[in-house]
Regions:
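Short, surface-exposed beta-strand/strand-loop-strand elements in extracellular ectodomains
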Residues: 96-117, 164
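Transition segment at domain starts
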Residues: 31-79
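Edge beta-strands of jelly-roll/beta-sandwich modules across compartments, strongly enriched
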Residues: 151-165
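A short beta-strand element within beta-rich, extracytoplasmic domains
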Residues: 84-95
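Extracellular and analogous surface-interaction loops
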Residues: 75-86, 137-142
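Extracellular carbohydrate recognition and processing domains
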Residues: 113-141
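Hydrophobic membrane-insertion alpha-helices, especially the h-region
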Residues: 10-26
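A short tyrosine-centered beta-strand micro-motif
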Residues: 145-147
Length: 165
């Protein structure tokens, strides 16, 4: 019995270490895998690594800034009992990296509202990287609708938005 105890303890430690490594790899690798994966973006999963991430709501205006972000985060949720269109006024500036705002409807349909790349040249197809106010229409479906910000590795951005019903 005394010979089996160290083997059992060793096996348990090995299993716990393997589980820990898998969880840590998922926590660090998953956010960088998210950007181009629409199925993951539309899922309930929220996975992001953030440095100096600040979010505040004041007088109906939501402001989100981040020095470095990789992955995705829900920045707005809205439940509606019927299909409705709402206007979103926003300023979005990516100073480093690549980011996009995605509307996720209750049936997990994802719609790209805007996408910016700090490296986009004048001839590249990308939304403007200026901080001028923009506007878009949110076509919300019955149920819970969400807006997520999705960032490639190490993206720095500032976002301010207001949604009118």
């Amino acid at each position: 019995m005394k010979k089996k105890l160290p083997i059992i303890i060793g096996c348990c430690l090995f299993v716990y270490a393997a589980i820990f490594v898998i969880i840590m790899l998922a926590a660090f690798l998953l956010p960088s895998y998210v950007y181009g994966n629409d199925k993951l973006i539309a899922s309930e999963l929220n996975s992001a690594n953030k440095i100096k991430y600040r979010r505040r709501v004041h007088d109906g205006i939501t402001t989100v800034t981040c020095d470095k972000m990789t992955g995705m985060d829900v920045i707005w949720k809205y439940n509606t009992s019927e299909d409705v269109a709402m206007q979103m006024n926003y300023t979005f500036q990516v100073t480093s990296g690549k980011a996009k705002l995605i509307l996720i409807q209750p049936d997990n349909t994802s719609i790209t509202l805007t996408e910016q790349d700090s490296d986009a040249g004048e001839n590249d197809v990308s939304d403007t990287t200026s901080s001028a106010e923009q506007q878009c229409t949110l076509n919300l479906k019955r149920g819970q609708n969400k807006i997520k910000i999705v960032c490639e590795k190490g993206t720095s951005f500032s976002l301010s938005f207001h949604i009118d019903s």
